[in-house]
Amino acid sequence: MGSVYVNFFEEYPDTSYIKIPNNPLDRVIGQDEAVRIASVAARQRRHLLLVGPPGVGKSMIAQALSFYIGRPNEEIRVVHNPQYPERPFVEIKTREEVMLEREEESSTSGTLIDPKDAPTSVAERLGYRCSKCGFYSSPTEMVCPNCNSPKAQIGTQGPFGDVFNVIGAAFGVQNNVDKVTLTRRNGDHDEIVVYERYNDKIRVLDEKTLERRRRLEKKSPSKTIVPIDRNPFVLATGASETELLGDVRHDPYGGHPQLGTLPYERVIAGAVHEAHEGVLFIDEITHLGNLQRYILTAMQEKVFPITGRNPQSAGASVRVDKVPADFILVAACNINDLPYILSPLRSRIVGNGYEILMKTTMKDTEENRMKYLQFIAQEINMDGKIPHMTMDAAQLIIEEGRKRAKLIDRKNNELTLRLRELGGLIRAAGDIAVFKGNKLIDKEDVEEAIKLYVPVEEKIMKEYGSMAAAYSSETTGSQRDSTYNYANMDDRSYE
């Protein structure tokens, strides 16, 4: 054991002193080659196929990849097609265009003023001011809290307006209005000004603001399905066809212009579209089955249509063509699942990316033990509910990693990289420390967790002696004697 390693353990009392890297890829333990290729793939926008057992860092590499590709620069919208509503258009807006639109929309919001700063007649007609006593209150209060008179302006509804106001107030009906239009002098000409109710304030819209609003209203109605401010990392593990490829929601009114919802408003983007300009991560990709074909099509064309997936739905007749789907695919699988990956899909990955075999162990060196300490600190910080670990306890975690490398991978003088299970062991030790009220996870906590954190098969063998004995203890005599019991079956049972 090297002297620097010993000095390090003597210098720092616990893992709270371990520095965690800011670079997400540097937090991946023991997968140096995979990290190097992933950093290149992020810069060059290459696909990745990560092959290896669970818990060796495939998900961490995929998530870290999204930090290197930059923020998206395009927003995807579907626009209403008046001539053929079932075929909405696709509209792509750059970040600059989206920001400009937001500025225009904010400029149409007008100016908010206090009701007391508005003209008296406006405040009364909008329901803020009592026309009798001049008291100001919320427009939702129909009766003045000061004089108990109806607040709506008397005379605004004809000669019987005061009668209607009293009756309306008695039955909880508001007689004031939401908007008042006036003219005011602006230099050498008159301009129209609109006053609107806005909670406890009044919104003032001048002529320029109204003109901007009219320009915005002339634009074709649209719906944003992939916003500009989105997470570039999209997880699609175990996704259904609808989640992966998008859909069009059902409308019980069949998209009727007056009663129903227009088709463009019912379009839903899939994961392949949400990952546009980002990373689409699919763990256990072979579980997608035939859906791999659609992933391949999206990778080839960099666009994929959205259509209704349910033939019985009103959305089945709606289709949006050429929806952008330009993503980096990071797929992951176990070694024994490789034959079940669609051959053209794998060829596409190899043709524009890399296949990486993840390591399961690393050399038991001083540097790698330091990486184990970093891993322990990362797991504790990530959990957020357990204390840090003493160095004596951390030595036991390292020793456990050494044992697992020998037991599972049959490697001597190596440390396991199947770190997910070790992370569970660290959390179990942390829970024990919390239960005891310890400020740090000590050696005894880890030893207790190691005894507790064993596979259930081991516990069954220790308790019952064999799996058959354990099964037998859970079945009745009639179940054991049944010819349909799997223990009583042989090959002739199927003839």
Swiss-Prot record:
GO terms for biological process: proteolysis; regulation of DNA-templated transcription. InterPro entries: AAA+_ATPase, CbbQ/NirQ/NorQ/GpvN, Mg_chelatse_chII-like_cat_dom, P-loop_NTPase, Sigma_54_int. One of its GO terms (molecular function) is ATP binding. The keyword Flavoprotein does not apply. SMART domains: AAA. Residues 471-495 are annotated as: Disordered. It comes from the Archaea. Its EC number is 3.4.21.-. ATP binds at residues 52-59. It is an enzyme of class 3 (hydrolase). Disulfide bonds: none annotated. Keywords: ATP-binding, Hydrolase, Nucleotide-binding, Protease, Serine protease. It holds the Pfam family Sigma54_activat. SUPFAM superfamilies: P-loop containing nucleoside triphosphate hydrolases. Residues 472-486 have a biased composition (Polar residues). Belongs to the peptidase S16 family. This is Putative lon protease homolog.
